[in-house]
Amino acid sequence: MCGIVGFTGKQQAAPILLDGLSKLEYRGYDSAGIAVFDHGNIKVKKCKGRLANLVEKMDEEGKPQGHVGIGHTRWATHGEPSDINSHPHGNKRVTIVHNGIIENYKKLKDFLVGEGYSFASETDTEVAAKLLDYYYDGDPMKTIAKVLSEIKGSYALGIMFRDFPDEIFAVRKDSPLIVGVGEHENFIASDVPAIIHYTRDYYLLDQNEIAVIKKDSVKIYDVHGNEIHKELNTADWDVDAAEKGGYAHFMLKEIHEQPDSVKRTIMPRIMDDMPDFSAEGFNPDKLKNYKNIYIVACGTAMHAGMVGKYIIEKIARVSVTVDIASEFRYRDPLISEDDLMIVISQSGETADTKAALELAKQAGADTMAIVNVKGSSIAREADMVVYTHAGPEISVASTKAYMVQISIMYLIAFELAYANGKMDEAECSRYTKMLEEVPEVIEEAIALESKCQFAASKLINADSLLYIGRGLDYALSMEGSLKLKEISYIHSESYAAGELKHGTISLITEQMPVIAIATQKNLEEKTISNIKEVKSRGAFVVLIAEPELDIEDGVADIVIKLPQADQLLMPMVAAVPLQLIAYYTAVLKGNDVDKPRNLAKSVTVE
């Protein structure tokens, strides 16, 4: 949520700040701004709306001229989207950009008003800026440390002091921030894509570390002023991975990247056709002794966890609880040192998931994180980390990250089933081999694109949709429904097909399309019966089915037959048409597919 960039070097700062912010648009935002040292003063340009609005404003008024600056894209939390609430905030002495939430801003604001300060905006960020100004005594490090001792909440801050025109100061707590290291130029950013065109090398800031960035040096300190020497990280993905590469949207590109993403994710964890998590410190002997397994996540990652629950319980015969992170952490869960907590987060920065992980660690449980971003907060805190190798996922609506998360859940299930004696080596090897073949089947599913586009054309005028399925198909329906509502803005809900008669069927009319999923042979007859129920009440039905399903004429209006795969692995295949239907529905409605309204890619506040 929100994006921060900062630059100091020999080049003009404004174009680099704007370019960096453009690479962070996927994080979601409603306003943008930059601040640049311009002939001894800090000049600020900011406005409500898209980055293009800011560019237009500067084309009319002139860009700030200077070699040091900070920039920000804002996703409103305190105060509505407006020019005045946009970042940067500050005064002639101190200017800042901020991601996160200052929880005690009201108390601090009242104090500052009592000291004679006035406020132009409704934001908590302006409070932090004025507090920095209040305590400033000519020593930025001392001032920042004092302010950190006063504020409560989460933050990533980029700070400029007028008295130090060659420097940017950066600090973080519970909100991601990196320091990019180039040749005679250095950067700060919320995420790697903002700097990847300029450098691959960066430092990860830890909690309450303060970075002092000049064009030829980066120094990092703790709040007591002690210098910290950190390991330099190098981004291991290609610059082109953050570009569309000829596709109309990042989402479509990322759908097409799924076969390769799955290969990169599973192959390092397979040895001699058997799952192998030894590099991650996953101990099979300990694995079989856990009393309970909890999978905790948010949004799409939680839906991947639902697939994990079904397959682990089915083949490993271990009870699994899947919980929404924001619910888990507040319900006093019964988790102990005998349990395993698996958290899933693409960014590794999801605030509620991170808090749930911390709760599990306090209870003494072992923790495993499935994340896509190396060195992220969740990755650094978990006992065991499984990195997915999806590469950068730019579109807000997750596709390839979901697919690789599921692929890891399968390998964990196979490992657990083998450790528990529920699978012998031959059967475990057979399933692992089938998983290795899934990327090719995903390719075949992507080839159904034109059928999915046709189905989407029949959905664009709907006000509401219903997704139904049973078992693994119900878990899939949850993700399909989320994808559609995220980017098409059409209301949709997912329901277990067997629950229709318990109330939901009252909503069925000719105006409500139904997307049904039937990939599990043992449940097909029941699902078809449910489809007939909605069809008899006038629903337009799109059926996504396994290839051998014998379907009577008239049961569904559109049938999308999937390529052949073992039914246990069908979620990885059936997810593709669900993604494509959502994508083309949004495209046909003329929506901004990659940056849907009100959404952020990385939800770093609670």
Language model segments and positions:
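Glycine-rich oxoanion-binding loops at beta->alpha junctions
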Residues: 49, 67-84, 272-284, 308-344, ...
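Generic C-terminus detector
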Residues: 225, 540, 553-555, 565-606
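Glycine-rich phosphate-binding loops that contact phosphosugars or nucleotide phosphates
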Residues: 288-437, 517-560, 581
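Active-site phosphate/pyrophosphate-binding segments
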Residues: 258-262, 266-294, 384-513, 589-606
